[in-house]
């Protein structure tokens, strides 16, 4: 004889399992996909970094034009529109090998081998420069600016992170624990994210303790780091990959152009358009992908 209460219990358990399974399947986010939208012309010259100004809809492009550490004065900054047109190829000139960029209140901060330069966005003229402590042993690479205007700069060859705060330019942290830092991203008031090229890791630097913790690894030559505007990050590998890293440190491959020998240097994300902008370095273009 079937026990009615036992049957009811079994049905409830089964229903609960089905509901739980359904909820778990819904909770798992769909994989992201990149769809190419446009590619600029090839008049750029070794574009290393791109930066979007949401107040003007201008895309800035740092062009090395030459070797990445050569002091030849041939580097320049271009301006582009959101549809991929180069509106001013040589907007700011006279740089050496410009790379990472950051914006704050009408000032564009750009690394230039051994120095950080401050450019007035209204004129395109360099107004201030900040030299590395040892100009012959410096390779300043990426820039990030916190909401309060504090500027952080990585030195990827000589394991340093500089800070420019209230006009004071200093080394914030140095040493092999940085593992050749490249990409940097201000992440709130208490920390910055650092891409350690030597280990292919995305790491968090606590600004109070200067201790580092690893968020995700296995991304080869980590270059650009940008937020998705929520709780995740897009990270580029200079060799030609782009990853998405969620808040739990789980990474997802979005782009791999290594077989075509197309690099992906210091990327940008335009949240309003869901566009990832990828400078292709030796291919002399910027490519825009829609995140779907």
Tell what function each PLM region has.
Residues 35-41, 85-92, 125-133, 168-175, ...:
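A short beta-strand motif characteristic of beta-propeller blades
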Residues 9-18:
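Bacterial N-terminal signal peptides
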């Amino acid at each position: 004889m079937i026990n009615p209460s036992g049957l009811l219990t079994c049905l409830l358990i089964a229903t609960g399992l089905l509901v739980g399974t359904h909820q778990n399947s819904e909770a798992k986010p769909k994989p992201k996909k990149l769809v190419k939208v446009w590619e600029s012309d090839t008049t750029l010259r070794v574009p290393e970094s791109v930066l979007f100004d949401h107040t003007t809809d201008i895309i800035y492009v740092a062009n090395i034009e030459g070797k990445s550490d050569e002091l030849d004065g041939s580097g320049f900054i271009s301006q582009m529109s959101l549809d991929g047109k180069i509106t001013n190829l040589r907007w700011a000139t006279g740089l050496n090998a410009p790379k990472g960029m950051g914006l704050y209140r009408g000032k564009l901060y750009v690394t230039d081998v051994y120095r950080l330069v401050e450019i007035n966005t209204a004129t395109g003229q360099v107004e201030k420069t900040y030299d590395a402590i040892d100009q012959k042993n410096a390779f300043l690479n990426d820039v990030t600016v916190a909401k309060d205007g504090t500027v952080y700069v990585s030195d990827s060859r000589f394991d340093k992170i500089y800070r420019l705060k209230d006009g004071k330019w200093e080394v914030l942290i140095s040493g092999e624990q940085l593992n050749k830092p490249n990409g940097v991203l201000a992440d709130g008031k208490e920390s910055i994210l650092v891409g350690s090229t030597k280990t292919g890791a995305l790491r968090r630097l606590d600004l109070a303790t200067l201790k580092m913790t690893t968020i995700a690894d296995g991304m080869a030559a980590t270059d650009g780091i940008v937020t998705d505007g929520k709780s995740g990050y897009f990270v580029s590998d200079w060799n030609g990959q782009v990853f998405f890293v969620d808040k739990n440190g789980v990474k997802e491959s979005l782009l791999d152009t290594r077989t075509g020998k197309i690099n992906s240097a210091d990327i940008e994300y335009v949240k309003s358009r869901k566009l990832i902008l990828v400078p292709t370095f030796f291919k002399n273009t910027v490519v825009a992908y829609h995140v779907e």
